[in-house]
Amino acid sequence: MTDIIVTQTLNTIGLRCPEPIMLLRKKIRHMQEGETLLILADDPATTRDIPSFCQFMDHNLLKSDLENTPFKYWIKKGK
């Protein structure tokens, strides 16, 4: 896989559900189609919530790193 070029970062470390998803929704709304967002999170609920959010909102979850905290998610904004 080629290197992912991150255009925005969202740090949700220390926040618990539903705050990470609320901030993700707000942040991605102000991004341009095709931009990539890196999310840092330590809430275990994000391992379920972020992939579901991406599928529901038609964004592309490019990669996730769930081995250690903080969890990392790379999301490419869809239409």
UniProtKB/Swiss-Prot annotation:
Catalytic residues (UniProt): C17 (cysteine persulfide intermediate)
GO terms of biological process kind: tRNA wobble position uridine thiolation
InterPro entries linked to this entry: Sulphur_carrier_TusA, TusA-like, TusA-like_sf
UniProt GO cellular component terms: cytoplasm
GO molecular function, one term: sulfur carrier activity
UniProt entry keywords in alphabetical sequence: Cytoplasm
PROSITE patterns recorded: UPF0033
Annotated localization: Cytoplasm
Domain of life: Bacteria
PANTHER family per record: SULFUR CARRIER PROTEIN TUSA, SULFUR CARRIER PROTEIN YEDF-RELATED
Function: Sulfur carrier protein which probably makes part of a sulfur-relay system.
Family designation: Belongs to the sulfur carrier protein TusA family.
UniProt-recorded name of the protein: Sulfur carrier protein TusA
Organism the protein comes from: Histophilus somni (strain 129Pt) (Haemophilus somnus)
Encoding gene, per UniProt annotation: tusA
